[in-house]
């Protein structure tokens, strides 16, 4: 391990906005506590984020799962001071950048959590979370249950999302976007917005209309507000900028979990959509981040 990474790990211990739980805080060792979601126990922060981490700021809480270096989390927090944001990732060296920025700029509405996303339900109480962002998550083409919009993950999210809570997916992956659409259809989930080319132009009644203009007049805007539409276009991660510079289209969808499950696995032609995704992996194109990292 390089000296630079060790230095970041050491500095991470000093950031009040970064929670790095030990394994014993979320795993029941008496139940044979290996790293398995079957052996989870509640973390002391569960149900108390606004009180303990955000010093009594009683604001809606939004998660970014697989936040990487945290630039999306911190950017949203700067734009929305009346919302508390928590970026979640397993990579401490990546979280260091976001936590350091939040600390140095004094952002009061940002926190970070270092944990596996499979264990996320150990940290949040029913109704504690208002929205979830999934930004450029690994599409996990070979493992359906590892996809962050799979029925298995929807069941986890349901346990802490407030009624009508929104899940946002922003991705360069056509595979993951089409899979998520199939999941929504199979489970009759309410879709607020969906586009396969976020920065493109669509033809409606013979007129060219940008997706941004379309979203301004959509249900998404009425539910989330026009400021949320602006943020969707104006806040970009490093990877998003890379993908755009190489000509890749950005997909986006927002939906709500409207019922308590069980959630149905969709009919989905994974072979076809893997083939459609193949150009992303040609030499010279931007590689995707490590599985589940989001950055």
Where do the model's predicted regions map?
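Conserved beta-strand signature within the Rossmann-like core of class I S-adenosyl-L-methionine
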Residues: 164-171
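Class I SAM-dependent methyltransferase "Motif I" SAM/SAH-binding loop
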Residues: 66-70
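S-adenosyl-L-methionine
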Residues: 100-126
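SAM/dcSAM-binding transferase cores
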Residues: 1-57, 195-295
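A short acidic, Gly/Pro-enriched loop at the edge of an enzyme's catalytic core
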Residues: 123-131, 136
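A short glycine-rich, Lys/Arg-flanked "PGG" loop and its adjoining helix->strand segment in the class I
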Residues: 149-163
